[in-house]
Amino acid sequence: MTLKNQVLSVLEGPVIARIRFRFPIAASHVTIAPQTFHVVARAIRSGRVLVRVPTDLATGVAAQYNDVARTRLNGTVVQANTMEVNAASGRLDQATVAHESLHAAYDLLRTGLDGNAEEASAYVVTALYCRMTGLPRPTWANGLIWAQAALAAQTLLAQYQRGSSGIPMVGNDEWMTLRQSVALHPVYRFAGPGGVFGLLAGSQYTHDG
């Protein structure tokens, strides 16, 4: 199976079909549901979003969605709307695909939210995917961001298990702690909207479809 088809299998698969939650933004909220990821699947099928294997991502960056074009170290260009992932076969790889696909969905849907909340919500998706597939926690929740994302995911899973109606909201305390953890992580801190500039100033990634 090609990498593209593996990614599509994740986005149209049974785990994504179970993911649903809301998180607060300003005086409103953003809703994540299976349909969010299906938007990305349709864009991949149509060629609007490309799936490629990365060759030069920064240390500590396992995968990346490019909302704008970027130039590789060798001078070649990665097109805008390109998802760079190494694989989509193992459970952790699939969780990473879900994470990057949420970034793609925000871009395609032109969602208005700061980059820090965007990253935090993508980590919640990753944690939910790992928990729902039974991936042993030391395999993935081995850092502060992951530990906080796991706590946020647990509040959602508890609501799923109770059969709560509607789409559950992430716990406020867990959400705010996760956002702070993302903002202070060296990968994000001063590197763009995912860090303190997103948390404190509302800086956003490019969401132009």
Pin down the residues of each PLM region.
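Active-site recognition of the HExxH zinc-binding catalytic motif
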Residues: 95-108
